């Protein structure tokens, strides 16, 4: 059985997405294969009014959902030290959750520490360790760029380990 998982790294200026397929093969010992379909980012400009930025996220997220038809969406939970950053990302995250609700799509959320633990075995791993694990798990020649897209793939992989 194949599942398509969309990983999202929420952000207002840059929202990363990564799409993988997870196929379970029924042998004597069940085996799962994971393949990367696509990754990228949705960008908005700080020079544009907030409402228009959120509309861009809304429209572009619908486009991604329409193109890839995910079965499950995995989202990185908010984790910030600065309140101003948290508020901006929370607004973008609200749009994201709205799009998922409109499409009746199930979603799961993971903290940064859960993602690091799942991919590296260490909850305090650094960003490069996680990105290298993403490239290794997906059999990629290099780390996906930009970082937001690599992070989104990490979130999707974390969800695939829970299936």
UniProtKB/Swiss-Prot annotation:
Where along this sequence does the record place binding of Mg(2+) 1? 9, 148
Can the keyword Aminoacyl-tRNA synthetase be found in this entry's annotation? no
Cite the Pfam families for this sequence. RuvC
Q: Which GO BP annotation is one of this protein's?
A: DNA recombination
Give the E.C. number(s). 3.1.21.10
Q: Identify the GO cellular component terms for this protein.
A: cytoplasm; Holliday junction resolvase complex
Cofactors that this protein relies on:
Mg(2+)
Name where it's found. Answer: Cytoplasm
Describe cofactor binding as the record notes it. Binds 2 Mg(2+) ion per subunit.
Q: Which CDD domains match?
A: RuvC
For this UniProt record, give its keywords in alphabetical order, as a comma-separated list.
Cytoplasm, DNA damage, DNA recombination, DNA repair, DNA-binding, Endonuclease, Hydrolase, Magnesium, Metal-binding, Nuclease
Q: Which residues bind Mg(2+) 2?
A: 76
- Role noted for this protein: The RuvA-RuvB-RuvC complex processes Holliday junction (HJ) DNA during genetic recombination and DNA repair. Endonuclease that resolves HJ intermediates. Cleaves cruciform DNA by making single-stranded nicks across the HJ at symmetrical positions within the homologous arms, yielding a 5'-phosphate and a 3'-hydroxyl group; requires a central core of homology in the junction. The consensus cleavage sequence is 5'-(A/T)TT(C/G)-3'. Cleavage occurs on the 3'-side of the TT dinucleotide at the point of strand exchange.
Q: Which HAMAP family match?
A: RuvC
> What family does the Swiss-Prot or TrEMBL record give for this protein?
Belongs to the RuvC family.
User: What is the protein name given in its UniProt record?
Assistant: Crossover junction endodeoxyribonuclease RuvC
**Organism from which the protein derives:** Nostoc punctiforme (strain ATCC 29133 / PCC 73102)
